[in-house]
């Protein structure tokens, strides 16, 4: 899995342990995700060479990583793709796409949790069809299953905060962090 980098930074590990606490308030969840994202932003951009780069947060939870990435890449365009996972089939449904006609050479995708990999696959496919040649997918937490699915894909790199070994019947990571979008924004299912 040469295209996958998993953070070994102790601060990232500590913050992910805090994020697993389901009693955190939404403001605390956002703060922890932002802190982890700062480290992942530096890690994911340290070898960036292309002058043509965009940031693509996956709506809505990917927005929680934007502050950190826009500080590291302050003048790159930010495009949005909205995808949700249908609850019964776990299939990704795209509901919003604000990519311009001309692609950037490199896109940095932000999505804090990669569970089944369905959303990741949908976004990667969309960006490849758009013409993007290099993709860096950044996630706070991912499943082993999803990372295995994406190992050694040419032109796609993954930078991950930590890896959980399994998924539950609803497609959530175990032990995971719950529905990160709901936790970030105080929504209830």
Swiss-Prot record:
One of its GO terms (biological process) is UMP salvage. Allosterically activated by GTP. It is found in: Cytoplasm; Nucleus. Pathway: Pyrimidine metabolism; UMP biosynthesis via salvage pathway; UMP from uracil: step 1/1. It is an enzyme of class 2 (transferase). Uracil binds at residues 173, 178-180. Keywords: Allosteric enzyme, Cytoplasm, Glycosyltransferase, GTP-binding, Nucleotide-binding, Nucleus, Transferase. GO terms for molecular function: GTP binding; uracil phosphoribosyltransferase activity. Its EC number is 2.4.2.9. D-ribose 5-phosphate binds at residue 172. Its cofactor is Mg(2+). It holds the Pfam family UPRTase. Its main location: cytoplasm. It catalyses: UMP + diphosphate = 5-phospho-alpha-D-ribose 1-diphosphate + uracil. It comes from the Eukaryota. 5-phospho-alpha-D-ribose 1-diphosphate binds at residues 60, 85, 111-119, 179. InterPro entries: PRibTrfase_dom, PRTase-like, UPRTase/APRTase. GO terms for cellular component: cytosol; nucleus. Binds 1 Mg(2+) ion per subunit. The magnesium is bound as Mg-PRPP. Catalyzes the conversion of uracil and 5-phospho-alpha-D-ribose 1-diphosphate (PRPP) to UMP and diphosphate. Belongs to the UPRTase family. This is Putative uracil phosphoribosyltransferase urg2. It comes from Schizosaccharomyces pombe (strain 972 / ATCC 24843).
């Amino acid at each position: 899995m040469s295209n996958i980098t998993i953070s070994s930074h102790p601060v990232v590990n500590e913050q992910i342990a805090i994020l697993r606490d389901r009693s955190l308030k939404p403001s605390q969840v956002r703060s922890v995700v932002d802190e982890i994202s700062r480290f992942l932003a530096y890690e994911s951009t340290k070898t960036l060479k292309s002058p043509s780069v965009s940031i693509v947060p996956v709506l809505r939870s990917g927005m929680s990583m934007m502050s950190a990435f826009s500080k590291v890449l302050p003048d790159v365009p930010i495009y949005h793709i909205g995808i949700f996972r249908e609850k019964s089939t776990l299939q990704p449904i795209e509901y919003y796409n604000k990519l311009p006609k001309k692609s950037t050479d490199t896109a940095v995708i932000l999505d804090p949790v990669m569970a089944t990999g369905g959303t990741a696959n949908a976004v990667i496919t969309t960006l490849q069809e758009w013409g993007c040649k290099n993709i860096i997918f950044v996630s706070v937490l991912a499943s082993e299953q999803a990372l295995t699915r994406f190992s050694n894909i040419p032109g796609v790199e993954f930078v991950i905060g930590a890896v959980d070994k399994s998924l539950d019947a609803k497609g959530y990571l175990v032990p995971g962090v719950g529905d990160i979008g709901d936790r970030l924004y105080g929504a209830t299912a």
